[in-house]
A protein has these predicted regions:
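Flexible, low-complexity linker/loop segments at domain and module junctions
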Residues: 1-8, 95-98, 293-299, 330, ...
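Active-site-proximal alpha-helical scaffold in enzymes
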Residues: 78-91, 145-146, 150-153, 158-194, ...
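Acyl-CoA/ACP chain-elongation machinery
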Residues: 39, 184-230, 263-277, 307-314, ...
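Conserved beta-ketoacyl condensing-enzyme motif
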Residues: 8, 24, 32-164, 193-202, ...
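Condensing-enzyme catalytic core mediating Claisen C-C bond formation in acyl metabolism
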Residues: 5-9, 36, 216-293, 302, ...
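Conserved small-residue
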Residues: 10, 28, 82, 103, ...
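ACP-dependent fatty acid/polyketide chain-elongation machinery
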Residues: 1-67, 89, 247-257, 354-368, ...
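Glycine-/small-residue-rich "gating" segment that lines the acyl/pantetheine channel
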Residues: 124-133, 174, 178, 194-251, ...
């Protein structure tokens, strides 16, 4: 059977850089950092005291106050991003065939704040017997965001959550892409969400020595591909891409941001947290996405890398790019928007996919900030264009987004300019 073409017709985002796609994209191009001291809890006894929090968000602008209390923060962010995306795509919900519209969101951890609150409450009152909130489980579980999005809009199509740590929302986008091109849906609200800036979240990642502890200079802590990088910066947020079958989009006169043309998955099969030192899984997943898209390395103008600012991960990803792209690696732009957003965990792929879509649409590459000229790692080839510190204008025919998760999960998607 001939596969259907899939385009992006709507965007939504709630990030540490802004509470919608426009604010987020503008801040990216300006090279702003979302990092600041943590405000959600007392960090006195924590080694990492800063993160990239979502700021100045009035949840009740989107969700009824009573309903919002029944949702973990990650679900609130997911729902807000989806509301933005559905509005942006301009679909007439009164006329839409809601049986052909689905929801696939990626979530890496889920309701960790809810878990903390309920278990903490139980620990204080366990002598009186269990007294759990009836919303404890529905608030906590990782699949519930997709459910709430479908309930909000009455979408009866495919509905589920993908969980593959930091690759979760890229897997969601890739899965939604396949469902549409196989004819199983006309439109899918896809993306991801995460809200793990909690005592357990920050404490757990700190115990793994995964987080930066540059507490005296949070804004400059996330510095991918610099020698002085010392770990990632926790972030939170959500991103939404409305994926739609091309003819369906054209029939309703939808605006088209870009075309999604390929996706790939692979496994490192190496270590539960560390990436393969030679970038094996990263190489495989990028090749899989290129093959799926029918593209060659020289067709890619921009790679939004996983680039978390960790000592091992950044090096292995660069190795994979050089191995696979060869001479073409030195002609394209590379950047890590995590230098600005922090690491959004399960939401990272969705927000970074949005950055790729907007790069393709606008012919501009957001920067990798916080690099200093003399801060070079001898294992990294600086002949590559990492788009350090300043956005760069160039033609972007196609953009590739990498995400890699604990467990060795790798996912990749490719967007290109839409043409008839």
């Amino acid at each position: 059977m001939e596969l259907k073409r899939v385009v992006v017709t709507g965007l939504g985002a709630v990030t540490p850089l802004g509470n919608n796609p426009e604010e987020t994209w503008k801040a990216m191009l300006e090279g702003k950092s979302g990092a600041a001291p943590i405000t959600y809890f007392d960090t006195t006894n924590f080694k990492a005291k800063f993160a990239c929090e979502v700021k100045n968000l009035n949840v009740n602008d989107y969700i009824d106050r009573k309903e919002a209390r029944k949702l973990d923060r990650y679900t609130q962010l997911a729902l807000i991003s989806a509301i933005q995306g559905v509005e942006d795509c301009g679909i007439d919900l009164e006329k839409a065939d809601k049986n052909r519209i689905g929801v696939v969101y990626g979530v890496g951890i889920g309701g960790i704040k809810t878990f903390e609150e309920e278990i903490g409450y139980y620990a204080l009152h366990k002598e009186d017997g269990p007294k759990f909130n009836p919303f404890f489980i529905p608030k906590m579980i990782a699949d519930i965001a997709s459910g709430h999005i479908s309930i909000r809009f009455g979408f009866h199509g495919p509905n589920f959550t993908t969980t593959s740590a930091c690759a979760s929302s890229t897997n969601a986008i890739g899965t939604a892409f396949n469902l549409i091109r196989l004819g199983k849906a006309d439109m899918i609200v896809s993306g991801g969400a995460e809200a793990a800036i909690t005592e357990a979240g920050v404490g757990g990642f700190t115990a793994m020595h995964a987080l930066s502890t540059r507490n005296d200079d949070p804004e400059h802590a996330s510095r991918p591909f610099s020698a002085s990088r010392d770990g990632f910066v926790m972030g939170e947020g959500a991103g939404c891409l409305i994926l739609e079958e091309l003819e369906h989009a054209k029939a309703r006169g939808a605006k088209i941001y870009a075309e999604l043309v390929g996706e790939g998955e692979s496994a490192d099969a190496h270590h539960i947290t560390a990436s393969h030192p030679e970038g094996l899984g990263a190489n495989l997943v990028m090749q899989a996405a290129l093959d799926d898209a029918g593209l060659k390395p020289e067709d890619i103008d921009y790679i939004n890398v996983h680039g978390t600012s960790t000592p091992v991960g950044d090096v292995s990803e660069v190795k994979a790019i050089v191995q696979l792209f060869g001479d073409s690696a030195y002609k394209l732009n590379i950047s890590s928007t995590k230098s600005m957003t922090g690491h959004l965990l399960g939401a990272a792929g969705a927000v970074e996919a949005m950055a790729c879509v907007l790069s393709v649409q606008n012919n501009i590459i957001p920067p990798t900030i916080n690099h200093e000229e003399d801060d070079k790692d001898e294992e990294i080839d600086y002949n590559l264009n990492f788009t350090f510190n300043k956005a760069q204008k160039r033609e972007v025919r196609a953009a590739l987004s990498n995400t890699f998760g604990f467990g060795g999960h790798n996912a990749c998607v490719i967007f290109k300019k839409y043409a008839e």
